[in-house]
Amino acid sequence: MSKVIGIDLGTTNSCVAVMEGKNAKVIENAEGMRTTPSMTAFTESGERLVGQPAKRQAVTNPTSTLFAIKRLIGRRFEDPITKKDMNLVPYHIVAGDNGDAWVEARDAKYSPSQVSAFILQKMKETAEGYLGEKVTQAVITVPAYFNDAQRQATKDAGRIAGLEVLRIINEPTAAALAYGLEKKGAGTIAVYDLGGGTFDVSVLEIGDGVFEVKSTNGDTFLGGEDFDARIMDYLADEFKKEQGIDLRKDRLALQRLKEAAEKAKIELSSSMQTEVNLPFITADASGPKHLNIKLTRSKLEALVEDLVARTVEPCKAALKDAGVKASEIDEVILVGGMTRMPKIQEVVKEFFGREPHKGVNPDEVVAIGAAIQGGVLKGEVKDVLLLDVTPLSLGIETLGGVFTRLIDRNTTIPTRKSQVFSTAEDNQTAVTIRVFQGEREMAADNKVLGQFDLVGIPPAPRGVPQVEVTFDIDANGLVNVSAKDKATGKEQQIRIQASGGLSDADIEKMVKEAEAHAAEDKKRKELIEARNHADGLIHTTEKSLKEFGDKAGAELTGAIEKEITALKAVMDGDDVEAIKAKTESLMQASMKLGEAMYKAQEAAGGAEAEAAAGGHGGASGSHDDKVVDADFEEVDGDKKGK
């Protein structure tokens, strides 16, 4: 039976591990290193270099050396963060045929999944060299806050690399698995994962082989690359003051600056001062120029103070969602190379009120956890159960543009949730299901993941057809959505594709905006619900008047019509209380219509009375509480649901 390898596909470095007996072993690459730079280069002769060889020649081949590709995975080219990234890297980021952000090297275009696949192939070859056999299956890790598009793109990268991806596992969860496998007893742990490009924090409960994620939060555009960029900017600004030349405009100099910034950052974790010395960094008419700048630890900490502070809010949110206090956390696990920075350790200690656990290697622990999960899936590791969560809420757009959640964030996966919706127009034969991901109350404020049509619904009055919408999230965090007409059994489904996924910036923006606009969202939702209630009441009352108005008398009919006109006059306004008041007035008036109908029933008797009673059902506006009015676009007609 072939081995399942565990791969930590990182922004800056990647790592591969495999189970040997009861223990996971990190495998050294051909260069004798336990981690491999996540870099790919294309040389002038057409050769492709991956890992350390690519990093070694980066300075002399800046435009064809690709790094930090993980930050582009699942992102659209028009994303503002993509535009920002274009100014930070010496290689070219271009628009792919599907509108995604791709990269260009030696006149050829590559998708981020392709470039990631080159790195995965290197890890696969490393494992095969050690094991002496072919490897076809892997567990690959992703940041916990990765969206559906990014997870799908990572799985695609595995397929391109010739690997069957048995599971996509969240990085903090993998780290917890590696930490807690041999631990006895129960406890609550926090995993603080600050890597090269992303930040995650997860709270887990561990006990008797069960690893249950209680909550996760993060920032998918915060990591070592941002710290490097701050140092690069500082060095470039200092050089410009001295020499009047902006090194950021020179791609060759930019690559040398990046290399020097990363080296200085690492050195300042163990020393208080370092010297950045780059001879012949550039030249002008007067001759060659050299860069020589001293950088202290305190200066570095000042440069990145806000970046470090940005990790605190997700920690607060994760604790709140998990329902625990910082003092109730038994252990804090540090993951990712950036956690070696003394300032980071200081902030973690200050927030959680305890020294973080330093017994795991932050560069290797994620790959080890992935290998353990591979062992679990193969049956080599017994009595281990992993329960992960989905990071963002999922739902559809319903009447008035409201975002109706079917699956809340931090729901344990795999999960399946169904809800029954109905039509917004009489005789509507088709509906459009629009799928969203986010935390805002209005669908338009969240990100649309995709949409699909359900056609062939038998014509019926609005609110009568029953359309069951089902969300299904698998153990990889990948989403399937289906819609089924319960009368005909007709069904349509969609697997959310990467091209419709969220960008890193969108997720970060959504959560932060949700917090800032919580009160505003609540008010807008209340207004929409009041309008929907009013609209439904007007519809049923007008229908009842049409059918039974002659039995109510001219005076009552006139009074009801007056109330309908008054409600219509305020319905499009923003005064919730006015809409509620006029709705209540119309309800009182329509109740009198019901009384008149009952009297007519008693007088008439027989079959005619029965028909009138059926009409009263319409007047009261009662319906199945489980049916939610939904906003659907009619596909093969002129009408649209409002």
From Swiss-Prot:
Keywords linked to the UniProt accession: ATP-binding, Chaperone, Nucleotide-binding, Phosphoprotein, Stress response
Keyword Nucleotide-binding among record annotations: yes
GO molecular function list: ATP binding; ATP-dependent protein folding chaperone; unfolded protein binding
Region called Disordered, residue ranges: 602-642
Top-level division of the source organism's lineage: Bacteria
Physiological role: Acts as a chaperone.
Family: Belongs to the heat shock protein 70 family.
The protein's name: Chaperone protein DnaK
